[in-house]
Amino acid sequence: MTEIADPRDRLIVALDLPSVQAAEALIDRIGDAATFYKIGYQLGYAGGLALAERLAARGLKVFLDLKLHDIGNTVEEGVRSASGSGATFLTVHAYPQTMRAAVRGRGAGLRILAVTVLTSYDDADAAEAGYGLPVAELVAKRAAQAAEIGIDGLVCSAAEAGSVRRIVGPDRLIVTPGIRPAGAEAGDQKRVMTPGDARRAGIDHVVVGRPITGAADPRAVAQAIVADLA
């Protein structure tokens, strides 16, 4: 696990919202209770990439969850473009050619995270998609490939975090979605964990969306999660 001085940096708030205006309103409500925000497809296609630059200019950290996967040159140039946004993290799918291209394009300030297997997948989903391995084995294989290629960190479920840590060692980042405070609904995530359990499992950053974005007091929820992560 990497050393992180400010426990707020361990929480990544997922801005899974339909507009930049909604995202900015949420960020204002959260205030200094959070320092790290994730922008994915929904917001990214609605002006979120420009928002990423503005947030970075304010000293906030940004995770571009774009899950790139294409031919090598396209990924390399896409990563190179994303590096100009000021983002801290960018995701790619954990296919060897994609990861190698991302490493070539990342530049100095951007960290590349490889998505092993989506946290909405279980073994039945993996089989339906044509993978010949159960989820745990597929995650382990992709984690080992990512470490060999030089990826900065892995995105995996909390259920696989321990095995991933053993494979990639102490210095690579582990980022985990599907984190739910105690008592929160799992939603469409199938492999979940509480923030405190995630911290004890050696996870560096947790991604939390709906429990914060849908809360009556998102600042209070963010503060409670950070306290659980400290």
UniProtKB/Swiss-Prot annotation:
One of its GO terms (molecular function) is orotidine-5'-phosphate decarboxylase activity. GO terms for biological process: 'de novo' pyrimidine nucleobase biosynthetic process; 'de novo' UMP biosynthetic process. Substrate binds at residues 16, 38, 65-74, 119, 180, 189, 209-210. It comes from the Bacteria. Coiled coil: none annotated. It catalyses: orotidine 5'-phosphate + H(+) = UMP + CO2. SMART domains: OMPdecase (SM00934). Pathway: Pyrimidine metabolism; UMP biosynthesis via de novo pathway; UMP from orotate: step 2/2. Gene3D superfamilies: Aldolase class I. One of its GO terms (cellular component) is cytosol. The keyword Lyase applies. Keywords: Decarboxylase, Lyase, Pyrimidine biosynthesis. The active site is at residue 67. It is an enzyme of class 4 (lyase). Its EC number is 4.1.1.23. It holds the Pfam family OMPdecase. Belongs to the OMP decarboxylase family. Type 1 subfamily. NCBIfam families: PRK00230.1 (NF001273), pyrF (TIGR01740). Homodimer. HAMAP family: OMPdecase_type1_B. Catalyzes the decarboxylation of orotidine 5'-monophosphate (OMP) to uridine 5'-monophosphate (UMP). This is Orotidine 5'-phosphate decarboxylase. It comes from Methylobacterium radiotolerans (strain ATCC 27329 / DSM 1819 / JCM 2831 / NBRC 15690 / NCIMB 10815 / 0-1).
